[in-house]
Amino acid sequence: MSFNTLIDWNSCSPEQQRALLTRPAISASDSITRTVSDILYNVKTRGDDALREYSAKFDKTEVTALRVTPEEIAAAGARLSDELKQAMAAAVKNIETFHSAQTLPPVDVETQPGVRCQQVTRPVASVGLYIPGGSAPLFSTVLMLATPARIAGCQKVVLCSPPPIADEILYAAQLCGVQEIFNVGGAQAIAALAFGSESVPKVDKIFGPGNAFVTEAKRQVSQRLDGAAIDMPAGPSEVLVIADSGATPDFVASDLLSQAEHGPDSQVILLTPDADIARKVAEAVERQLAELPRAGTARQALSASRLIVTKDLAQCVAISNQYGPEHLIIQTRNARDLVDAITSAGSVFLGDWSPESAGDYASGTNHVLPTYGYTATCSSLGLADFQKRMTVQELSKAGFSALASTIETLAAAERLTAHKNAVTLRVNALKEQA
């Protein structure tokens, strides 16, 4: 199905409607699973030697020193333009502002007289950031991960990226307070962060995107007692746009294409009650596509994408909630009026002047978002992902005495005698003191 094919949602059967919202399969092949398992074993048992061998094999790079030196980082920064450095600083300022505002106030309440309950927040002690390499270095992801890690107060923040690491990534890491940077990529980097090596420290939690091998490595280490926690499940990028008759077709097309150029497995969907707008957007997509350097990639993504015509905006919202997109762009008049009805989306962009690119880079929100329908249960990355909550309770003698019979009754009902005894012994001790 080509992207210029308009689909009337209400002419489709329920089965056809479900098929229209089905995402491409992303399950790892048995081959990838086995390869990753072998990599994890080798890195865990052989440490730095295995990391160097994998760099030579997969990255075609002979790595002597795994850790990037301060001199190398300074030299990388010197090679960048002032314009780019200023743009990074501006983005970081907005990211800091938004994520600092997410700081949770402590909870301190007396649930009944003499029973004090608190909730306090502590940072995850050590985190590892994985940043992919390639022709287009994702230095913006460094800003999105390292900034909240710093605000949260994580004691150790380390970064791994395939060698040779781009100057932009090195400078962004320094700008955001990353303490150590390592020339390690792929599944072997995830293994090093999860298990540690002679050079790479073991961390408590791993963040960052990657290819199928990196994704599978994160999955495997997250399920091991000796591994590490991960940020969230990963899948191909996606955007859904809701547009009305007042939308600008060129704007809508540019937003769809900015997602499609991410990769051939990206998915884009347009929902509109106006068939004329849908046709104009399709025409604008073709015009803009011809000028894109990554047109081939975008065209592959568009082959699995949809132009859907609905009866009204309310139906657009209902379909969007059913799909649960990573990015939701609402290019309608009075776009904010629809926000309260949105129940599942990673990040929402309102109006003509809020392109996805703003959130990807510099508005301040985080661009690490749940994909593949995980918006139904997962949130966009934020300060809380670099923190953990801990509860504290303190009962006075009077508070304990007032609550004792309740606890004893509940423990007895669950037939947990030791639980009941822990209370009864104290009750008897208080009676003896009286």
Curated annotation (Swiss-Prot):
* Functional description taken from the UniProt entry: Catalyzes the sequential NAD-dependent oxidations of L-histidinol to L-histidinaldehyde and then to L-histidine.
Subunit (UniProt): Homodimer.
Location of the active site: 326-327
Q: Which UniProt keywords apply?
A: Amino-acid biosynthesis, Histidine biosynthesis, Metal-binding, NAD, Oxidoreductase, Zinc
Family affiliation: Belongs to the histidinol dehydrogenase family.
Which species does this protein come from?
A: Salmonella typhi
A GO CC term attached to the entry: cytosol
Q: What is this protein called?
A: Histidinol dehydrogenase
Cofactor annotation: Zn(2+)
Q: Which SUPFAM superfamilies match?
A: ALDH-like (SSF53720)
Q: Which HAMAP family match?
A: HisD (MF_01024)
Q: Which GO terms describe its molecular function?
A: histidinol dehydrogenase activity; NAD binding; zinc ion binding
An example Pfam family from this entry, by short name, is Histidinol_dh
Q: Which residues bind Zn(2+)?
A: 259, 262, 360, 419
